[in-house]
């Protein structure tokens, strides 16, 4: 009986010793205390916002489109146009799609006989008008181009023309200034025999500057006039055949643009 108890007792003591040793080696780390949530007072006035959300105090200047008006001469004329002495059968938006075609006949502005002058109100202050013109004049004084207009006695027209006589270069570029019904020289005539040209007429105060370009990017000054007229209307025109020949030469305007100079 004692032998049996010894065999039973020793293993039991051995197991107990192992368990006690393991207990000595196990370190029970207390769990971390739950985080304490502290609600701090708002410090909007005392604490600056991060720099990337700081509001700016600089005023924002709105972008101003330098183009006041542009007509591509597509299916119908843009708003604001009026015809002076219109002959409907002599102008078209269909014969050259995307362009205004005017059959330039006889008559002149100062004689109040030129037909189909297309005009719209001029902006206040400084401005410039521009068009791409295709024109091949071959009769004396035939003219097509831009016009800044007060009335039949006070206006400036600038474009391509054919002119014989004193101060003329036959086919070329011309700028005509009429003041109080009289032509004001010079006309800044320059030989130009290409059919296509970009015309630009600029108003700056009392100065009127005529520029041309072959590509619409680089412009060359033709000349300038001083005028105290009040520019009321702007637009395009074609005509001025004074030879009495019934032949008309079409002038084709690809677009008309009014913008800040």
Language-model-detected regions and their locations in the chain:
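Bacterial N-terminal signal peptides that target proteins for export
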Residues: 2-12
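Extracellular glycan-recognition regions
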Residues: 25-28, 37-261
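C-terminal motif of bacterial Sec signal peptides marking the signal peptidase cleavage site
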Residues: 19-22
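N-terminal hydrophobic targeting signals that begin at the initiator methionine
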Residues: 1-2, 24
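Hydrophobic alpha-helical membrane-embedded or membrane-associated segments
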Residues: 13-17
